[in-house]
Structure formats: C-alpha cells, structure tokens
Amino acid sequence: EYSNAQLLDLFSIFSANPDKLTMVVIALATSIASTGLPLITEAVTLKDRVGLAKLTSGNLQLFSFFMFPATFGVMLLAYPLNTLFYTPDSLGSNVLIQASFVGLFLGLYMLVSNMLQGMFENKAAINYLVIGFLVKLLLQYPAIRLFEVYGPLLATMIGFAVSCTLILKRIHEVAQIGRASCR
C-alpha cells in the first residue's frame, strides 16, 4: 500500500506532467485532420470515390510520416525532457514514454474521427467513441491494480485502439477503399 504522499507523487507523475509534453505531438495529428477535412467533405459531396480513397490514404500516410518520428523522438528523449521540465525521475520518464505511445492512438483517433465526420458519419463517430470509452471504463480498475501508474494509460490506449479500429473499418466501407484506388 502507498502513503498519501506517495499517492500524490504518483498522481502528479501520471496526470499532468506527461500530458503537457505529449499534447504537442498530438497537436500535429489534429492539424493534419483539420486541413484534410474540407477536401474529404468535398469528395463525399461530389461522390468522388477515387478521390476520397486517395485523400483518406494520403491523410493516414501523412499522419504516419509525422507522428511516428515525433512520438519516437519524445520517447527517446523522455529522460532529458522530463528532467528539463520537471525533475530527474526515472518513473516520470517511463510514464512519459508510455504516455507518448498512447498519444499515437489519441492522435490517430483525432485524425480518423475527423475523417469519418467529414464523410457525414457523425452518428457512427460518436457511437464508436462511446464504445471505446466503455472499454476504457471496464479496463481502468483492473489495469490500475495490475500496472499501477501505467494502468490508466494502458486502459486509455486500448479504448482508443478499439474506437480507431471501428472507425477505420467504417471509413473503409464508406470510402470503398481498395488497393487499386489508392495508387
């Protein structure tokens, strides 16, 4: 069991500290999603399936091009970044690494949910968010018990992974993406 002081330390390491640094990386995904949204909506309105498939594929490739290096850069520099902004602490650095990895899923969710809403599938986007949130709620307590400070991040990652999987499946159906249409 933990003392109140230890719990407060763990909570500060988990809650606020890594989020400030990972949100910079997540902002990249949000900007990618925002710039592609009008083009996706236009392609849906014009019933341009080939253009929609190319835009969808291009957005996912652009996301990968920026997010993977940015995320892995933060992961590699976790200890120096954590030391620069907070204090030298290996647990805080490890939580930052995990939070950066979770940020990939959050960024992907931002991208694909925007794309799905641009395809006028707002109800599906909300339903998939709710499903992911319910998965997170179900996993939160067991994950905290098993993985302690990493538990909430793991539950969040799995919840967003479920939402992203459902959204990507729906995008595939709506955009009728095939291998030939993305060339």
Predicted features and spans:
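Helix-loop junctions and terminal segments of transmembrane helices
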Residues: A27-K47, T56-L60
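Interfacial segments at transmembrane-helix termini and the short loops linking adjacent helices
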Residues: Q6-L8, M75-L106
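Interfacial transmembrane-helix starts/ends
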Residues: S15, D48-F65, P69-L77, G92-A99
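Short runs within selected transmembrane alpha-helices of multi-pass transporters and secretion channels
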Residues: N94-F120, A124-I144, V149-H172
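Alpha-helical transmembrane segments of polytopic membrane transporters and translocases
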Residues: Q6-A29, L60-L62
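Transmembrane alpha-helical segments of multi-pass transport proteins
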Residues: G132, R179-R183
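Hydrophobic/aromatic residues within the transmembrane alpha-helices of Major Facilitator Superfamily
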Residues: V24, L28, I32, P69-F72, ...
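Short alpha-helical transmembrane segments in multi-pass integral membrane proteins
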Residues: L55-M75, Y150-A175
